[in-house]
Amino acid sequence: MPKMKTHRGAAKRVKRTASGKLKRSRAFTSHLFANKSTKQKRKLRKASLVSKSDMKRVKQLLAYKK
């Protein structure tokens, strides 16, 4: 069976915290800011954690990422 590889696209988008959780940036932050409220833009600046339901799948993609 071939070696399992780290999914490079996922590895660039996710960082592991000291406690082992996965930190990610939020979606909807690339353009069209004129249509978004100030409050929405402020909340989008903060990083978020990968949800509990997605953890197993994302951890498989990041098999060897520290």
UniProtKB/Swiss-Prot annotation:
GO molecular function: structural constituent of ribosome
Pfam families membership: Ribosomal_L35p
BP-aspect Gene Ontology terms: translation
Composition bias, Basic residues: 1-26
Alphabetical keyword list: Ribonucleoprotein, Ribosomal protein
Matching InterPro entries: Ribosomal_bL35, Ribosomal_bL35-like, Ribosomal_bL35_CS, Ribosomal_bL35_sf
Region Disordered, annotated ranges: 1-49
Any one cellular-component term (Gene Ontology): cytosolic large ribosomal subunit
Similarity section: Belongs to the bacterial ribosomal protein bL35 family.
Protein name: Large ribosomal subunit protein bL35
Source species: Staphylococcus carnosus (strain TM300)
Lineage: Bacteria, Bacillati, Bacillota, Bacilli, Bacillales
Gene transcribed to yield this protein: rpmI
